Amino acid sequence: MAHKSHRHKALQAQLEAQPTISLISQKTRKPPAPSMDVDQDDDVLISTNAASAPNTTDPSDAPVSATTTSSGFAPLTAAAQSTVLKNEFRRIPIPPHRMTPLKRDWVNLYTPMVEMLGLQVRMNPQRKAVELKTSGHTVDSGAIQKGADFVKAYALGFDVNDALALLRLDDLYLDSFEIKDVKTLHGDHLARAIGRIAGEGGKVKFSIENASRTRIVLADTHIHILGSVQNIKIARDAVVSLILGSPPGKVYAHLKAVGARMKQRF
């Protein structure tokens, strides 16, 4: 009996040591509350909004300093620009028949390029050309192009004072074409077309120049027009009409009508 009681006590001690399992608690256990998932979703949404929100501390939105450009580099100084432009060089060929007028008007030709543009100018009689080069006094990056256009206009036959407008104004251009570009003419027909453009004593040419506010050079079969884009078109249309055979009176009437429209517009 003592042995049985001792064994019973050992079994009872083992049962007390093991955790009790309640079937009722397992059946009645509630599922986890969805509030945690909602909180997690809220956390995700908040983090998404935070990620999509603009970054106010973006360095690109910071104001650009006055001493730097948008690219982050400081602008070049006038001295630095002059060092960049010092190697630019142009050589403008001069036709043989314009070499004598070039020597006569040389002072009036190179003075504005030196004083206004700061260029170095040299006449090269061997090459029959005028050479231009930028210097430390050249400030404008387009100065050498203006000088080249000025010399080219003089080489085509324009007067120095007329060509000087290319240096003072920015909206002037040169337009050149040949009579054969409009109509193929030969012999007396070509001579009559040139005569219609020039007129007696150059009256027709002067009338076109005054009406269109341009300057025209008639060099054999080549026609050169100096002026703004709109005025060049007016003068070119008048010259083309004369080449195609229109009488000068009809061209005059058309120029007057165009001039009246221009005055009303401006």
UniProtKB/Swiss-Prot annotation:
Key word Iron-sulfur present: no
Compartment(s): Cytoplasm; Nucleus, Nucleolus
GO MF annotation terms: rRNA primary transcript binding; unfolded protein binding
Basic residues bias spans: 1-10
Compositional bias ranges of the Polar residues kind: 15-26
Signal peptide: none
InterPro entries: KH-I_PNO1_first, KH_dom_type_1_sf, KH_PNO1_2nd
GO terms classed as biological process: endonucleolytic cleavage in ITS1 to separate SSU-rRNA from 5.8S rRNA and LSU-rRNA from tricistronic rRNA transcript (SSU-rRNA, 5.8S rRNA, LSU-rRNA); endonucleolytic cleavage to generate mature 5'-end of SSU-rRNA from (SSU-rRNA, 5.8S rRNA, LSU-rRNA); proteasome assembly; ribosomal small subunit export from nucleus; ribosome assembly
Major localisation: cytoplasm
Alphabetical list of Gene3D superfamilies matching this protein: K Homology domain, type 1
KH domain: residues covered: 190-239
Domain of life where this protein originates: Eukaryota
Region (Disordered) residue spans: 1-40, 50-69
NADP found in the keyword field: no
SS bonds (residue pairs): none
Keywords, comma-separated and alphabetical: Cytoplasm, Nucleus, Ribosome biogenesis, RNA-binding
One cellular component (GO) term of this entry: cytoplasm
Family (UniProt): Belongs to the PNO1 family.
Known role: Required for small ribosomal subunit (SSU) synthesis. Has a role in the processing of early nucleolar and late cytoplasmic pre-RNA species.
Subunit field text: Component of the small ribosomal subunit, ribosomal RNA processing complex (SSU RRP complex).
Protein name as catalogued: Pre-rRNA-processing protein PNO1
Species in which this protein is naturally found: Cryptococcus neoformans var. neoformans serotype D (strain JEC21 / ATCC MYA-565) (Filobasidiella neoformans)
